[in-house]
Amino acid sequence: MADAGVDAIVAPTTPIAAPLLGEENTRIGKENYPTRALLLRLNRPANLAGIPAISIPCGFTSAGLPVGLQLIAAITDEPLLLRIAQVAQTLMPKARRPQV
């Protein structure tokens, strides 16, 4: 990544917002997908490759559900990744507890 002048890759943590408890399927367009598979889809590659990645909260949907931001760094850049995440988190909306 450093050869390309990139410190980190920024991506969504998941392709969907946090699902409601017990939501086994999620509709995207005209298709239904297993919610669990969707939740793993975007963070599985870095995990399987052993590449440092971190997910931080980055906002909320209009329904108040949390949305995550994934940061991915080169295999030797875990300290840099943590510094980027720390700075990025200060720029995000403050976390709030959901009403139960």
Annotated model-derived regions:
Residues 47-100:
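Structural helix-boundary/capping segments
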